[in-house]
């Protein structure tokens, strides 16, 4: 766990680093997103946010962020398939849905892992959004890492 200002960040460590490197405060991010400072503060305090909010933070600053699930210690994902349809249809959690499908993991099994109902997992994939902590926990349970890359939107 990394101490970042007032927060001990593990899941959202990369968000804290982004803020620190760019001299951003919770107020500055909140103003850019058009939300309350308390919302951003809450995400950092809880070390969790909806995927849509994580993407919004980076997009607001002209950046795109891409996530991938990879085996621990692997630099590039051996499962990475360029141009998979899910990635464009579901830009936020398509990587997660794609992974569980490739591994033959059923949504019922995902729901059981987190102690939620299958309809909750169905909702995530229908609306292409879930809390980032679920993805981190899934990765931990399966011996995976959540990797991310950040680039300019026009790249």
Please provide the spans of the model-predicted regions.
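Residues within the helices of the helix-turn-helix
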Residues: 16, 27, 97, 108, ...
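The alpha-helix within a helix-turn-helix
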Residues: 19, 30, 58, 100, ...
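DNA major-groove recognition helix of helix-turn-helix
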Residues: 44-45, 61, 125
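Residues that mark the N-terminal boundary/hinge immediately upstream of a DNA-recognition element
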Residues: 14, 25, 50-53, 106, ...
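A short, Lys/Arg-rich alpha-helix, primarily the initiator
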Residues: 1-22, 75-103
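DNA major-groove recognition helix of helix-turn-helix/homeodomain DNA-binding modules
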Residues: 52-67, 132-148
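Short amphipathic recognition helices of helix-turn-helix/homeodomain-type DNA-binding modules
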Residues: 68-78, 151-155
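Short alpha-helical DNA-recognition segment
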Residues: 23-40, 104-120
């Amino acid at each position: 766990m990394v101490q970042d200002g007032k927060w001990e960040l593990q899941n959202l460590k990369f968000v804290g680093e982004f803020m620190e490197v760019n001299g951003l405060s919770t107020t500055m991010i909140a103003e850019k997103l058009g939300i309350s400072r308390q919302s951003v503060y809450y995400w950092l305090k809880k070390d969790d946010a909806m995927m849509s909010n994580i993407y919004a933070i980076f997009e607001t600053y002209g950046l795109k962020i891409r996530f991938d699930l990879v085996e621990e210690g692997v630099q590039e994902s051996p499962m990475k398939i360029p141009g998979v349809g899910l990635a464009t249809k579901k830009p936020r959690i398509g990587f997660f849905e794609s992974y569980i499908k490739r591994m033959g993991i059923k949504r019922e099994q995902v729901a059981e892992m987190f102690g939620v109902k299958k309809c909750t997992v169905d909702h995530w994939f229908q609306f292409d959004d879930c809390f980032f902590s679920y993805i981190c926990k899934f990765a931990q349970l399966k011996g995976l890492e959540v990797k991310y890359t950040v680039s300019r939107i026009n790249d």
